[in-house]
Amino acid sequence: MERRFILLFAFLLSVSLPGNAGAQNKVALQGKWRAVEATSNGEPPPAGLLEKLTIVFVGETVSVMGSSPTRFTIDTSFRPAHIDILNSRRQVGIYELKGDALKLCVGTDGDRPKAFRTEKYTDHTYMLLKRVKE
C-alpha cells in the first residue's frame, strides 16, 4: 500500500499552463507543499507516510518526495481545474488552489475524478496539501 501511494503521488509532476489564469496558477504553485490529508481508493495512507509526503514545484517541474520530475498540463477553463499527467501511465485529475491550500484528486487510465474524494475500486487518489513556509 505504501508503494502504491508513493508511485501514484510521484506521477504529480511538472507544470505547463495555458493562458493568463494558468500562468497565475503556475506562479502560485511554486514552492514546497506538505500533505495534511490523503486517501487512495477510499483508504488512508499507511502509518507514517502522510507525514513524509511532500511535493515541490520549481519552474515547470514538480517532484514528489524527492522523485524525478514529471510533466503535466493544467487547464483552468474547467471548474474544478483539470490536471493531465503526461507520462507512460495516463493520469487525469482535478485541482483547486486557494491561498496556501491545494487540493488534488487524480485517476488513472483517463478516469478523471469529479469530486475531491475517493471511493473503493476507483483508482483515484486525493490529497490536501498546505504550503510549507520556508
What are these regions (language model features)?
Residues 1-7:
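Bacterial N-terminal signal peptides that target proteins for export
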Residues 7-16:
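Bacterial N-terminal signal peptides
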Residues 15-17, 21, 41:
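Compositionally biased regions
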Residues 20-34:
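N-terminal helix-cap/turn-to-beta initiation motif at the start of protein domains
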Residues 34-52, 58-118:
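Contiguous, well-ordered beta-strand patches that form the walls/edges
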Residues 120-122:
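Short, solvent-exposed loop/turn segments at conserved positions within beta-propeller repeat blades
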Residues 124-126:
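Short hydrophobic/aromatic beta-strand or adjacent loop that forms the aromatic wall/cage
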Residues 128-134:
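Short beta-strand-to-coil "C-cap" segments at the C-terminal boundary of structured domains/repeats
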